[in-house]
Amino acid sequence: MCWTNYIAIPLVLKKPLRVYKVGTLSIFCGFISLFRDFRYRESQTMPTVKINPKFTRCNLFVPGYKPQMWDTFYIHEGYHSYLTEEMAKYSMNEYDDIGVFEIPAGATVYVNYRHREIVSTDIRYLGSLKE
């Protein structure tokens, strides 16, 4: 999962936020995220990471058409999650599991509301989603 959006505004959470990740449950290390193979143990808060949005200006030139330009921000680092259970279910396949996580108050986040994705500086694994 690579977070992209046309704006990148950092928000600091005033209260904890529940989010969801797609990955694999493991009896040895809790939950393994599909994104970057991060490993999470239940109730363990992960180390704080720094997030640096990268800016890119894209140009599209097609002969006979008006040139188009758009700006995009990319975020590769940080803890990538989904805001809703439905979006996590939509992004998984039959072999994946969904983990429930909490972004603690005070964490910095970047939100893409259109894709219901969020990137945070801190996160804690709460357990697997029970269906």
Model-derived segments and spans:
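Conserved NAD+-utilizing ADP-ribose enzyme module
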Residues: M1-Y79, L83-E131
